[in-house]
UniProtKB/Swiss-Prot annotation:
Substrate binds at T53, D124, E147, K177, D181. It is found in: Cytoplasm. Pathway: Amino-acid biosynthesis; L-homocysteine biosynthesis; L-homocysteine from S-adenosyl-L-homocysteine: step 1/1. The keyword NAD applies. GO terms for biological process: L-homocysteine biosynthetic process; one-carbon metabolic process; S-adenosylmethionine cycle. HAMAP family: AdoHcyase (MF_00563). Belongs to the adenosylhomocysteinase family. It comes from Sulfurisphaera tokodaii (strain DSM 16993 / JCM 10545 / NBRC 100140 / 7). This is Adenosylhomocysteinase.
Amino acid sequence: MDYKVKDLSLAEQGKKQIEWAEIHMPALMEIRKQFEKEKPLQGLRISAVLHVTKETAVLVKTLKIGGATVALAGSNPLSTQDDVAAALVEEGIRVFAWRGETEKDYYDNIKEILKYEPQIIMDDGGDLHAYVHENMPQLKLFGGTEETTTGVIRLKAMEEQGVLRYPVIAVNNAFTKYLFDNRIGTGQSTIDGILRATNILIAGKVAVVAGYGWVGRGIAQRLRGMGARVIVVEVSPLRALEAVMDGFDVMPMSKAAELGEIFITATGNINVIRKEHILKMKDGAILANSGHFNVEIDVKGLKEMAKSSRLIRPNLEEYELPNGKRIYLLAEGRLVNLAAAEGHPSEVMDLSFSNQALSVKYIYENRGKLENKVYNVPQEIDETVAKLKLNGMGIEIEPMTQEQIEYMKQWRYGT
């Protein structure tokens, strides 16, 4: 079996990490039991570009137990957990991923997992989907899935331009994904990454959050909960209004740059923090990114104008500006929660990856019946995931009476 990981001797530690995740992912483990019994993915070939974490390992093992053959590459050069990658190889998964990949390594690994002629592809960020469309028109795919807001935006653009060649389920758009993974998971793991990289006190700091989507609001809420004074930067009047009504200050980055001590980007867009903003910042300002790609902070511009730079501690680099101020960049401007920490807690990835597993099953069962467009996760899958999670937490919900069911179907009775 082909694979390329950093060190197979790390496999034993990786297995322990995966076991720890499995304990905290009851919904996906219940799906695994069903997959083991029914083998709904028998004969299916899957290639996936996902963050190679212990939680992803639980998903990939579940797909394999369901009958699929899986090849896996990492979706970020700094997010792979090398012990987990080694453990997955021993589980019979073709893994091409290691922490610290170059850009060439990253795309070479994507090429490797596509050699197995997948029938379904799974992506986190849209790079795999884009690569297939640009370089492998011969692939005959039943469909694909996409985990992130960034990837869904790219896929919707492909659909609108008429170039999308297969159906894709936007796992990101499931209620049981974005309400928990994007908001709660990213909120917690982003703060975790910042603290691991800096060990600073959050209380009393002025924090600037760029973007008030589900990710941004989760980060802003947790910063406030830890005692920070939070400023939100938004381009959408609707989200800006929501941030104001949630009690946050809202202003352009040009003004926030002079006030902030911690800056976190979560927009999915490019050059949100630019050179003109950085020059206005206070001495000692900290820059972190929680968007998918390392383009939200103008890292190139920062490096070009810096007089000098030095690594202070892992994932914390100091840049001295011509004006004498020092700016601190976390994790090279890449995903701070995965590069400087371990990503989302297993409990929240339980929801996202349950949606992934059931979406793959749905695509396989409906192959040839779906149009070449971006679909939301079917409501029945979303509700199934919520029920499985509640069951795993030992929580019961109130059932409706027959009278209530009938009342919800009628229109005659009012005041």
